[in-house]
Amino acid sequence: MSELHSLLTFPVRPISEEHYLGELSRFLKAGIPATYTLEQVAAFERSELREDADEVSDEEEQSNTTPLHILARSLPGNLSDDEEQVVLHMMDMLFEYGAGWNFIDFENKTVGDLILERNGGNRESPLYQRVVEAGVSAELLLRKLNGGDVEFIDENEIDICAEASAEVVPKDALDDSTGKVSSVSDDDATAADPDTYLNTKLKYTEDALITENNKDGVMMDWETDIMKLAADTLVSRKPVGESVVLNIGFGMGIIDTFIQERNPKKHYICEAHPDVLKKMKNDGWYQKPNVVILEGKWQDSLNKLLDEGNVFFDGIYYDTFSEHYEDMLDLYDIVVGLVNPEGVFSFFNGLGADRPLCYDVYKKIVEVDVATYGMNCEYTYVDLKGKLPDWKDVKRSYYNCEYYYHPKISFA
């Protein structure tokens, strides 16, 4: 462990500016990177001892135990308010010198995970929120540097935070300039690329919709309570029987069933997958008098509605598979033209839901993005403790947080 890392274990109490800030500044100004990891220290010490520096464990290759991890893991349980302010200044200094917000350490934890462990899971604590703020700033800056193209999650970070798709997209599936899927392995192509997904056979089970071969979870019935809340949101702006609503992505039809129970005046459903459309026909959705089926990709169907200018919605919901946050940004452009001034937009919020830190970062990023359209995003907190499945019948989990932020977006 280096002197920098040792300092961040807080060997001296109380934690004071005099003892810690000056020393931290001295190390950083001397050129020690704010991202200097324990794994790098270990590799250096091996080389100094003339050991084989190439003999590195898989865990060491994949982990990055940064100074911020040391700080977070060493936080005293009885931190005073004054000490907390000093720690915040130390975090500010580390971020100023380039510390990353979402690296994973040797225990597969982010700095945010460690802080939550130390403070009893309080996501509103100043220390945790400081990491969230750093994540938002870093991701928005990265987008700006990429010329406006969305490529949240940089090298070695893609496995930590998922984007808008339910599944995590591997790093090698992303084009470096645009963040769009360019080439993926056969196993991950379905979850990463909409065109591949639309040509993939689907299977309806008792409690899920999955891809037939890979068993990617497209939709599962644990989402039922979330969909009920979403249906209530869509029809909340008009009296019963007067709402005109749009759902993008039928899936298992959970939200659409709830919408029908609320007797909308008109209920539009946009769906592109042929297997889902076939089930909708078999289940009688095409025969419902107040239902309009928009077959095909929403990018085509909704732009056509926008061009015609005859249909406007009191509520719009978005829940598709294999799409990403860049697709949602494109959708925002359309939503503002199709939703009534008093209407509401919502979506299945799985953005970054692989980890609480990433989920909380994307929560704020959505707020920032919709604000550019003159819209506010309000969230309803939903407790999911004990409600998530065991994921044994699907390829991998697509939601790992024990809580859910239900978004309600409307014009300010």
Swiss-Prot record:
Annotated positions binding S-adenosyl-L-methionine: 197, 227, 250-255, 271-273, 298-299, 319
Catalytic class of the enzyme: transferase
Signal peptide: none
GO cellular component assignments: cytoplasm; nucleus
Domain RMT2: 190-412
Claim: Ribosomal protein is one of the keywords in the record: no
GO MF assignments: protein arginine N5-methyltransferase activity
Enzyme nomenclature, EC number: 2.1.1.-
Coiled coil: none
Keyword Nucleus (UniProt): yes
Keywords recorded for this protein, A-Z: Cytoplasm, Methyltransferase, Nucleus, S-adenosyl-L-methionine, Transferase
Record-linked InterPro entries: Arginine_N-MeTrfase_2, RMT2/GAMT_Mtase, RMT2_dom, SAM-dependent_MTases_sf
GO biological process, one term: methylation
Subcellular compartments: Cytoplasm; Nucleus
Complex and partners: Monomer.
Similarity remark: Belongs to the class I-like SAM-binding methyltransferase superfamily. RMT2 methyltransferase family.
Biological function: S-adenosyl-L-methionine-dependent protein-arginine N-methyltransferase that methylates the delta-nitrogen atom of arginine residues to form N5-methylarginine (type IV) in target proteins. Monomethylates ribosomal protein L12.
Name assigned to this protein: Protein arginine N-methyltransferase 2
Organism: Candida glabrata (strain ATCC 2001 / BCRC 20586 / JCM 3761 / NBRC 0622 / NRRL Y-65 / CBS 138)
High-level lineage: Eukaryota, Fungi, Dikarya, Ascomycota, Saccharomycotina
Gene symbol of the encoding locus: RMT2
